[in-house]
Amino acid sequence: MALRGSHRLEVIFKRCIASPVLHSQAGNRRSSQLAIKGVDPNSNGNSGQYQQNGEHKEKGWRRLVRFFVPFSLGAAVSAAIIQREDLTPTIAASKMTGRRRDFNFIADVVAGCADSVVYIEIKDTRHFDYFSGQPITASNGSGFIIEQNGLILTNAHVVINKPHTMVQVRLSDGRTFPATIEDVDQTSDLATLRIQVNNLSVMRLGKSSTLRSGEWVVALGSPLALSNTVTAGVISSTQRASQELGLRNRDINYLQTDAAITFGNSGGPLVNLDGEAIGVNSMKVTAGISFAIPIDYVKVFLERAAEKRKKGSAYKTGYPVKRYMGITMLTLTPDILFELKSRSQNMPSNLTHGVLVWKVIVGSPAHSGGLQPGDIVTHINKKEIKNSSDVYDALADNSKTLDIVILRGVKQMHVTITPEDP
């Protein structure tokens, strides 16, 4: 900018020197001065007169330079400032506005499907809030509307195995409705709810079979009752077998993503960039490792449930749970242990097996006994726990209490839990 300004000043100055108007004005002043002194302006004159004329000429140019240079420099600087203030912000703002419009694809996805995402609360009817007098929230999760007449899809672990509770659903517009559990498949961890309201926004279902690793996805839900919370990431794997996750009785290849799936958005939709649900958010192992149930498996569950409803019965499958402890858990397979140890320094290096407590239901026996999310169960009643099946076997035992050995970070602890009958 400084070079361009000085160049302009030089050009303007040269033009002024060569200007016939300025030459004419300077000549007229010189002729007038010589005429007053009685000197012929057209004569050559003597050397003294010539020297005097030269001095007059030199003084005239000095006046011109003293007047013109500061004026020209100020004009050039002012023009540069005006150009910078008037043009630069306009161009920058125009470019940024275009980027927001062209590249904010995540916001476009959310705007198209957020209205179909709901918040699910499990209320404990035995315990009441001191101030409001309402049942306390024992658990929460998310779901999404799949039919306009109030059918909602979620995870089974969000709504079942919670005795003495009631289910409430809050829509994106703030309205709250009681809900009934219609269909449950504990094997695939899927369930449907029904609320008595019509003309709802419906989530479109896509195809998980066409997904590729590296595709962008968006996880929607309501963690901690914060409606329409959004996390984004990519598909890390489309074929993560349930055996790798230590999930028993499940023949499912899960979707793995680095989009954060938490307690609150569990049961919510995992959406592609077309705004279609391609999975149901299921669980998070650690930062950057979360899993979702592919929507193709969900469609099979929904078809079977619809057939059952036509016959006047509900679709309910899964293994029976004789007693209730109140946790969601995940078997620590060698692959998961490797990932956990590589991401956290609080994992004991000699740990080779166990069950990770992923979620603890408020007010449950596990919560009352002191279990916390992130604890690792290694023994129950002195029996080694290698997978989630061992925990279910311990619950099926007739022991009144469960003496559980856990790892909380690198510290080993004992907790005692008294399971409840469902």
UniProtKB/Swiss-Prot annotation:
Its EC number is 3.4.21.108. Keywords: Apoptosis, Hydrolase, Membrane, Mitochondrion, Protease, Serine protease, Transit peptide, Transmembrane, Transmembrane helix, Zymogen. The active site is at H157, D189, S266. One of its GO terms (molecular function) is serine-type endopeptidase activity. Residues 325-410 form the PDZ domain. Residues 18-74 form a propeptide. It is an enzyme of class 3 (hydrolase). It is a single-pass membrane protein. It is found in: Mitochondrion intermembrane space; Mitochondrion membrane. The keyword Transmembrane helix applies. It holds the Pfam family PDZ_6. It catalyses: Cleavage of non-polar aliphatic amino-acids at the P1 position, with a preference for Val, Ile and Met. At the P2 and P3 positions, Arg is selected most strongly with a secondary preference for other hydrophilic residues. CDD domains: cpPDZ_HtrA-like (cd06785). Belongs to the peptidase S1C family. This is Serine protease HTRA2, mitochondrial. It comes from Drosophila sechellia (Fruit fly). The lineage of its organism: Eukaryota, Metazoa, Ecdysozoa, Arthropoda, Hexapoda.
